[in-house]
Amino acid sequence: MKTYHQKPTEVQRDWYVIDASGKVLGRLATQISTLLRGKHKPTFTPSIDGGDFVIVVNAEKIVLTGRKPDQKIYYRHTGYPGGIKATPYKMMLAKHPDRILRLAVKRMLPKNRMGRRLLSKLRIYAGPNHPHAAQQPKPYIPRW
């Protein structure tokens, strides 16, 4: 029996909507990255973008466990000498709640063109509303 390789023209994409309220950040991010890559499908092919579109609502209500809300710090660098910037989790949650989940998912995807294309299929909204009703997204309940 030959190994099946999916072709880009054979990909069937679905839209899923996930409610992030009360969900743990890392556990939710793993589920989202699996959906984006298409690893939940029996036709998964590593070199083909066969994943689905994911809409996340209520990103501002995401949860971290333990002392991480007080201790977690996000680092970035401007590119200039001495240009390292640190942003605590609580400040990031107040200003950019969608960026927290986007960074967690981005770091779980491949670090190449495929990963950037997969990340473009992720739509994150801080509140409960989203403008993608025309795509008729199916509700997705994460396992954890």
UniProtKB/Swiss-Prot annotation:
It comes from Chloroflexus aurantiacus (strain ATCC 29366 / DSM 635 / J-10-fl). This is Large ribosomal subunit protein uL13. Signal peptide: none annotated. Belongs to the universal ribosomal protein uL13 family. Keywords: Ribonucleoprotein, Ribosomal protein. One of its GO terms (biological process) is translation. NCBIfam families: rplM_bact. The keyword Zinc-finger does not apply. GO terms for cellular component: cytosolic large ribosomal subunit; ribosome. InterPro entries: Ribosomal_uL13, Ribosomal_uL13_bac-type, Ribosomal_uL13_CS, Ribosomal_uL13_sf.
